């Protein structure tokens, strides 16, 4: 259909017609804790975090969905329409970095995501007792979790560890702090302390290293070879002796060997 506008009166009539046309749904907007954009929520270990998702500009009831990472959150029936809340309590270190997303059920492209930033003091773990033989290699692995990230260091017998070039090596990742010692000596005996220091707290974990004498183990191959040689020698000796005895017995039984009278 072609609209032909010839004057102001016709323009007003056209505007009235357009306004009287059936209107679609108003574009709904979501907010989480009053915010319309994705954001990071700073929180602490051991507290409770509440997230409230609400629909704005809706002309009819809207159903809401909550996701934790990629898994849908099971909501009660009274906690789905227009306003929906989820509660994380108590928050622990495993919740750090977790995404919570509220979505409009009829149009899941409409969403708001909240990422938890959980601060907590250093948590240390590892094998606290190790026994190794002299001249072997050993690694002391200190597992660490911390937010904010902790500053790490190694101590030996309550003093800062002096690293020996070629024997000591330190390898650090976000979740581990490893001390490797090659060709350990008796002087490496002692208590090694993994120390983690953050703005929240300083934590220490002790690793006890015992270096024992190297046990000399005779290689199995030479022993087996020696046994085989002994057995073969004995067998050959017995065989030769048996052959000689049989010859002697044969001479005794031979009539031609008797002395003539």
From Swiss-Prot:
N-glycosylated. SMART domains: IG (SM00409), IGc2 (SM00408). Residues 1-26 form the signal peptide. Glycans are attached at residues 57, 82, 92, 117, 157, 189. The chain crosses the membrane at residues 216-236. One of its GO terms (cellular component) is cytoplasm. Keywords: Cell membrane, Cytoplasm, Disulfide bond, Glycoprotein, Immunoglobulin domain, Membrane, Repeat, Signal, Transmembrane, Transmembrane helix. Gene3D superfamilies: Immunoglobulins. GO terms for biological process: brush border assembly; cell aggregation; cell migration; cell-cell adhesion; cell-cell junction organization; cellular response to hydroperoxide; intestinal epithelial cell maturation; intestinal epithelial cell migration. It is found in: Cell membrane; Cytoplasm. It comes from the Eukaryota. InterPro entries: Ig-like_dom, Ig-like_dom_sf, Ig-like_fold, Ig_I-set, Ig_sub, Ig_sub2. PROSITE patterns: IG_LIKE. One of its GO terms (molecular function) is protein homodimerization activity. Residues 237-261 are cytoplasmic. Disulfide bonds join 53-102, 142-194. Residues 27-215 are extracellular. Residues 27-113, 121-206 form the Ig-like C2-type domain. Its main location: membrane. Homodimer. This is Transmembrane and immunoglobulin domain-containing protein 1. It comes from Mus musculus.
